[in-house]
Amino acid sequence: MVKNIKIFLSLFFVVVLGLLATTANSMVIGIDLGSQTFKVSLIKPGAFETVLNEQSGRKTISSVGWFKDERLFSSDSFSVWARNPKQNYNLIQAFLGIKYKEGLVEEISNGLPLGFKVKNDTVRNTVSIVYDDDTNYSAEELTGMLLRRVKDMASSYAGSSIKDCAITIPPYFTQQQRQALLDAAQLAGLNVLSLIHDVNAAALSFAMDRTFLEKNESVIFYDMGARHTSVSLVEFESHNEQIKGVKKNKTVSSASVKGIEWDEKLGGFDFDMVIVNHLKTLLKKQIPSANVDDIKITIKLLKEVGKMKENLSVNQQAQIFIGSLVDDHDFQATISKQQFEELSQSLIERSLLPLKKLILSTGIKLKDIEYFEVIGGGVRIPFIQQALKDYLKRDTLDKHLNGDEAMSNGAAFYAASLTHYFKVKEIKLKDILLNSVDVEINNNIINSGGAGETLLEETEDNEDNELNNSGNEQQQQQQPTINQGGLKDKKIQLFKVNSKLGIKKTVSFSSENGFSLFLNNPTINNPLATYTVSNVPTPGEKYNFTGKPKIHCSFRLTTSGIVVLEKAEAEITVSLIKPQPQQNKTSSSTSTTKKNTTTIETTDGGSEETTDETTTKQQQQQEKEEEEEVVVVEKVIEYIQKTIRVPLNFTIKYNGCVEPLSKELSQESNDRINKLDQVDRILRELRQERNNLESFIYETKDKLESNEEYLKCSTQQERDQLVEELDKTSAWLSDALDNDNTETEEYRKQLKDIKKKADKIVNRVSQYQLVPVALEELEDTVDKVKPMFEIASKDLNVTAEELKETTDKIQSVSDWVQEKKSEFKLADYSKDLQTSSFDIKFKLYDLERTIKEILKKKKKPVKPSSSKKDKSSKSSKGKSNSTDEKDQKQKEQKEQQQQQKEESQFQNDGAEEQQFEDDHKVHDEL
């Protein structure tokens, strides 16, 4: 508990106190999309928290499926897994962005009971997941459904729609798998700011509440999830930087990933299957007729094994009991902690291999490891922890992080840092590429350049490489020239292993023709894409140049680990005519204007400018003579050389690769999911109305039988009649449940009808409860009004008759209250009361209105004394008596304050009066 509080406080100070949001809806989420469960962390102004699901759980099962044509998610889907394994889909993320092959499901499941089938999607060269004979879904669609559920859950929890997010991925995901996940997120309506390796998201969580000013720290993060194990070495460093424009320093931290290793087929599920296989052996002995390979039996065993594994973490043995596991046969068995460890020996050895590889590849010494953080559900197994301690020669393993939520917290922090509306602690994540990328250039340019011509230019992308995009660091550039032997081998290592994510590289060479660029992961033989570049400029009318154009192809390695060709340009040096300075023609123009005008005297002695035919002929003759006198000077044309870059067109093909969702396919998938969402909404409304009707029937029956108030407020005959009507409605409901065609509106109409029949008794019960309360309220008001009115009435400008009338009305209401209280005590509650709560409310309203109206009467005018009258008449001829005026104003102010004080007793009654007027209208209608 204390540890969780510390974690919460650290997140609070890191994010909440350092968080500036510019808009009301500024929110981001981090999604840890695990194979078994997913966790979601939310950052919004003033809060950094884990999103709770409908059951108030902090983690949710990653499952989607159908049962009786109804789509189900998470625990609902998981609960019917054994009953409908063919249409319940687990481990869907493992099918993202992979090619189809025979036995794929068995290979991915690794013994897990996946009951669905897959087919070959020949259009996109990937897998298609079978729903029935006529319907298939892509892995992107099913994952998109799950992510849309995540989005809706987070938006409901936050109270506002959320789109921006970061999603964790295993480090071994290929570019096709990463792109497929991005496509799935787009179908869900999410804006993925970046993907992030899950183990490195945990590293960000580690750095959020720490600084490393004293020394750099090397930390290994060991994450064993449900399906894979990954290990990362991260070096943390902090330094102080001066804030621009302010004489203050800020602390900037960095998390540099030095290496990552993994086992993509080792996780907590594998240890579960060890126990499942052991139980199958015992089951076969107990019930020889049992088919232990039956998928439904395997699923039932697997559901119980999770609890057994938890028990073995703290106890020496665990038991299992499943009733009617095989036909009518029950199954009961036990397994000890020692047996579990012995059966898992090969897995224990495998659990150390990624760690050994990491230490070997990075060259780090065990003594230099400051912390060894363990996260994920798999490391809760005691003998796994012991094996790690023995290898590391440590007495304890570090557990500073929440093993379940560190990844989602780190992803949310990462997402917030990539937005413009959050300012968080400055931590620069320097993640790395885990598989090198080569680019191969086609045969058209084998002999296009000389040795050493190809240039590989590297540029750091400040826009999305650094966690905090403060812009403090200048753009770094490296321009190493790589001798490709005149491109004879045509291959260039574009990005090597451990290249920093978020950088750009430009490949430059000379070519006269179009060409193709083939991207590939050579270490895992994974083709990525083929870019065909065209419209390379040639010398002609449009471009006046000589020689071969120099081609520049700019590739970007995104923070999500995806390589794309951003642009291709041809650099050429063209000859342009040097612009000549323009001559000043103002004087000649003025002169010409003067030549083309003549002055004609008018009869009134004025002058007028005109251009008649005679004048025009004279001007033409004069201009002709002037042109003959012009000396012809030869114009010299000068040329200048200018280097320009011409954008080139390119297309992309995925020959032999898994294709991303095209715009058209994405729209089709989105439409399919929207239709399913609409069906879900209709089913929810139908179920809600059905439940409302069913609840009303049962609750009303129960009240008629045992509720004291209902028994008082009804006769036996009325109760019997209502019960009979309820039974009829119940019979209708029973038939409707068997009829799948019953519409939502029919349930709604049945509920309305039965409520109308129950209104007589329900209203009596309501009045039985409301009348005493209303009488008490009215009596309390009268008790307060009496003394207040006696005081206030002395200063009112009212007649004695008006005063008596109001006083009598107050007393009349008081007497009426006492009369109705006595009447209520003696009333027959099985009949309608003579006085309702509306009547009492009207009395209250009428009394308050009367008091307010009389308090608005003006005060009696103060009569001035005779001496003051004399002084006043005298002062009218000169200056007024300022002292008397001042006294008079003060007295008037006091009187006004007194009046306001008296009226303030009723100043809040306006809203109540309006409400009561509305109620009274309803009462009149009734």
Curated annotation (Swiss-Prot):
This entry's Gene Ontology molecular function terms read:
adenyl-nucleotide exchange factor activity; ATP binding; ATP-dependent protein folding chaperone
Q: Which family does it belong to?
A: Belongs to the heat shock protein 70 family.
The cross-references to Gene3D superfamilies, in alphabetical order and at most eight, read: 1.20.1270.10, 3.30.30.30, 3.30.420.40, Actin, Chain A, domain 4, Substrate Binding Domain Of DNAk, Chain A, domain 1
Map out region (Disordered) in residue numbers: 458-485, 579-628, 857-926
Q: Which UniProt keywords apply?
A: ATP-binding, Chaperone, Endoplasmic reticulum, Glycoprotein, Nucleotide-binding, Signal
Keyword Signal present in the record's keywords: the answer is yes
The gene name reads bip1-1
Q: Where is the composition biased (Basic and acidic residues)?
A: 882-904, 917-926
Q: What is this protein's function?
A: Probably plays a role in facilitating the assembly of multimeric protein complexes inside the ER.
Question: What subcellular compartments does it reside in?
Answer: Endoplasmic reticulum lumen
For bias kind Low complexity, which ranges apply?
Answer: 467-479, 582-605
Motif Prevents secretion from ER boundaries: 923-926
Q: Which residues are glycosylated?
A: 120, 136, 216, 249, 311, 468, 544, 584, 596, 649, 797, 881
A cellular component term, taken from the record's GO annotations: endoplasmic reticulum chaperone complex
Location, primary (coarse class):
endoplasmic reticulum
Q: Which Pfam families match?
A: HSP70
Q: Does the keyword Endoplasmic reticulum apply?
A: yes
Q: Spell out the protein name for this chain.
A: Luminal-binding protein 1
Range of residues in the leader sequence: 1-26
Give the superkingdom in one word.
Eukaryota
